[in-house]
Amino acid sequence: MAKKSMIQRELKREKLVAKYAQKRAEFKAIILDINSTEEQIWEAQIKLQKLPVNSSASRVQRRCKVTGRPHAVYRKFGLCRNKLREYAMAGDVPGLKKASW
């Protein structure tokens, strides 16, 4: 089980990403726009750098909904491999069954 502080840190990052997503997209659009002048690009880059580091989407890490484990988390289920196997064996995940051939 992950520490509560780690789970809260990830939730805080998700909130920051949502809060600054539009600003970040606007600055990136200016930077990638062919018609932007060098001065506009520089200003956009500086403003982008001044945004909080944790507001970047790449800083958010998926965690297991049950245990908070950060590795081996299946996106489709939101569970880590251990809990997914446990729930699948108990029959709690509809449509999922153990493969045998």
From Swiss-Prot:
Keywords: Ribonucleoprotein, Ribosomal protein, RNA-binding, rRNA-binding. Pfam families: Ribosomal_S14 (PF00253). GO terms for molecular function: rRNA binding; structural constituent of ribosome. GO terms for cellular component: cytoplasm; small ribosomal subunit. Belongs to the universal ribosomal protein uS14 family. This is Small ribosomal subunit protein uS14. Part of the 30S ribosomal subunit. Contacts proteins S3 and S10. GO terms for biological process: translation. Binds 16S rRNA, required for the assembly of 30S particles and may also be responsible for determining the conformation of the 16S rRNA at the A site. InterPro entries: Ribosomal_uS14, Ribosomal_uS14_bac/plastid, Ribosomal_uS14_CS. It comes from Francisella tularensis subsp. holarctica (strain LVS). The gene is rpsN.
